[in-house]
Amino acid sequence: MGSLFRSESMCLAQLFLQSGTAYECLSALGEKGLVQFRDLNQNVSSFQRKFVGEVKRCEELERILVYLVQEITRADIPLPEGEASPPAPPLKHVLEMQEQLQKLEVELREVTKNKEKLRKNLLELVEYTHMLRVTKTFLKRNVEFEPTYEEFPALENDSLLDYSCMQRLGAKLGFVSGLIQQGRVEAFERMLWRACKGYTIVTYAELDECLEDPETGEVIKWYVFLISFWGEQIGHKVKKICDCYHCHIYPYPNTAEERREIQEGLNTRIQDLYTVLHKTEDYLRQVLCKAAESVCSRVVQVRKMKAIYHMLNMCSFDVTNKCLIAEVWCPEVDLPGLRRALEEGSRESGATIPSFMNTIPTKETPPTLIRTNKFTEGFQNIVDAYGVGSYREVNPALFTIITFPFLFAVMFGDFGHGFVMFLFALLLVLNENHPRLSQSQEILRMFFDGRYILLLMGLFSVYTGLIYNDCFSKSVNLFGSGWNVSAMYSSSHSPEEQRKMVLWNDSTIRHSRTLQLDPNIPGVFRGPYPFGIDPIWNLATNRLTFLNSFKMKMSVILGIFHMTFGVVLGIFNHLHFRKKFNVYLVSVPEILFMLCIFGYLIFMIIYKWLAYSAETSREAPSILIEFINMFLFPTSKTHGLYPGQAHVQRVLVALTVLAVPVLFLGKPLFLLWLHNGRNCFGMSRSGYTLVRKDSEEEVSLLGNQDIEEGNSRMEEGCREVTCEEFNFGEILMTQAIHSIEYCLGCISNTASYLRLWALSLAHAQLSDVLWAMLMRVGLRVDTTYGVLLLLPVMAFFAVLTIFILLVMEGLSAFLHAIRLHWVEFQNKFYVGAGTKFVPFSFSLLSSKFSNDDSIA
């Protein structure tokens, strides 16, 4: 893995690919994932590029594979994983693969079409059989037909008129029979009555079982109906109404003999159709099983082939159209691998003239490549979310690995909560190879991707929880308190000592609401707690006052150290980019401004802690007053922290005042002087011009020494401000904005770090309230039923702890930690104006199809 401190050194390379070997060379490059292609045909439409026909062929193959996957999934056939990453298919096998897939598609569509046709015929025959069975007794029955709706007039006692009677009336009696869905029966009957004006008689009955609709495949409830009518015009109306309501009409036999013959024929045909349908389904499943063996590999191969042609469309042809020219960004350490990939592709294609590459100088800014692993990837993503780092500048992710979980833990510090978070993250880490976790839903996937961040956040929270001595809002007495309560009783001291000190007696114990421990009394304070805060503070009424003072000062100290470290990292950027004047004219004034004010504030805090004990604490001056007096220069003499304090503060204020104009005007004036002189600091040595060679002939004229020199100076050329681009007004305005932003930002950013204190206080108080409202109530029950009450109380306490204190409070602390890194820390040195290096790599392809077919 490359360095995480700074991005990889990149170079621009020109590839010369023979037409017959270009496909194989790009296939080898895609497997290695070493280079990022530049589009040399930006002014050419995607429909006018050289290999658009091949891309269309790949899209057609993708369409066929999508159809195959859909049919295999519909048949509930498992898709075997097969080879994880098969190579791109050779060109000589592409046409064969296309013919096989097209032939398989035609066969599947034909078999599927025949199967659906057989299935539809079978369902129609089954419906016809049910219709004959139900309507068999309609003409033999003589029951009273009761209308469903009041607007229907009552019928005669006989539901159907006698056929002989109709013959005597001279009318022609007709029948229409079929099936209709249950939900359409009432509307269907109403429409028949209104349209036919009562010249129809409808008889219907519900089927005992649900049948599948041949059109939709939905299993629904059906009704069998028989419509008797007289007159040809009425018959036409009835048939049209049946079509409107999507009724399934079947011929109605006129005689019992005809009914019996139809029934026998239907039974025979149904048995034959069952046999043919089963054989068709077996054959279709065999074809799909055979296709499923290679469909996953085919998907990957087609995606790789399409990606290769996308990259070939970015290349340009030379004047002879026999050679493709490509420009790629490649890390310098991967140049040998790039050459080997070209040799491998040329060897596989059997070309007599191998493909080759040359590095070319450029003034363009290369993309940023920072190699990560599964541990550092999450922290790098946090930095990249703010902005991808500029080329070769210091990468904050290296330090974020420690500072981010630590600042989170300062706000979240609780031993119990941190340990629960650590266990959850440890569970994700130990099961990181589980396929269900890596393919889970979005929220769980987000936790899984940040498992190492959660692990360190939980681990650091355990550490800060031990310092705060907080475990679910309660203190843990591991080493014994450093305070001795018994030493405060008067009985433990001599009468002479009792006259000099305020001690406790029985009356004091009975009548005082609060008792104060005096560390000046011998034996009361035996020394500091070995690690963290003494557990006796958990019982003190002034506990919150003490913790607020401690956490506020700690937040200021951590914030100033964090920001100063960011300014120091900026020095590494200036030295790397050969801009030493920025060190003296920008970084040094910034450090002086920061340390002379806020560094001195840290000094006063630590000095007061060390110089004043419990005996002299009443004489200790206020740091706030002393810090304000530092800028007011009071005439009256005050008792300072140390001798000579006023002189030291005057010197620090003078340095601060002098640093501001240097920061404001130093860099613009120096660049103006440099622009007018042109002979200072080696400008004559750097005044060369980097020219890109646009053809193979020009590249061949370059000597190896020139190419090496161009590569080594590419970084300087990318950032060099030429004489033609110099604009003093713009530089002055930019530096003025930077100076004002920095000076005001030092104050606002220092105040912003007080969120460490605020969120730590909020988390501790919320945890304390949750304990007091739930666990304290459950633990105070002394009856026999106390255990039974404690179980639901503990369960409710655990649920609220997880969702409120771990999830909600953890998310809040997480966002505030991100803010402190993005704004307060990274703006001191991090530009974040680069572009990410996205290599042409087959590992970035997915085996699943999506609407976006381009290579990410």
Swiss-Prot record:
Tissue specificity remark: Relatively high expression in kidney and liver. Lower levels in the spleen, testis, and skeletal muscle. Also expressed in the thymus.
List of residues that carry Phosphoserine: 695, 700
Protein's GO biological process: cellular response to increased oxygen levels; intracellular iron ion homeostasis
Keyword annotations from UniProtKB, A to Z: Cell membrane, Endosome, Hydrogen ion transport, Ion transport, Membrane, Phosphoprotein, Transmembrane, Transmembrane helix, Transport
Transmembrane segments: 394-412, 415-431, 446-475, 550-569, 588-608, 652-671, 740-764, 786-824
CC annotations in GO: acrosomal vesicle; endosome membrane; focal adhesion; perinuclear region of cytoplasm; plasma membrane; proton-transporting V-type ATPase complex; proton-transporting V-type ATPase, V0 domain; vacuolar proton-transporting V-type ATPase, V0 domain
Record topology, Cytoplasmic segments: 1-393, 432-445, 570-587, 672-739, 825-856
Location of this chain's protein in the cell: Cell membrane; Endosome membrane
Pfam families, sorted: V_ATPase_I (PF01496)
Membrane topology, as annotated: Multi-pass membrane protein
UniProt-recorded Gene Ontology molecular function terms: proton-transporting ATPase activity, rotational mechanism
Subunit and partners: V-ATPase is a heteromultimeric enzyme made up of two complexes: the ATP-hydrolytic V1 complex and the proton translocation V0 complex. The V1 complex consists of three catalytic AB heterodimers that form a heterohexamer, three peripheral stalks each consisting of EG heterodimers, one central rotor including subunits D and F, and the regulatory subunits C and H. The proton translocation complex V0 consists of the proton transport subunit a, a ring of proteolipid subunits c9c'', rotary subunit d, subunits e and f, and the accessory subunits ATP6AP1/Ac45 and ATP6AP2/PRR.
Assigned protein family: Belongs to the V-ATPase 116 kDa subunit family.
Name of the featured protein: V-type proton ATPase 116 kDa subunit a 2
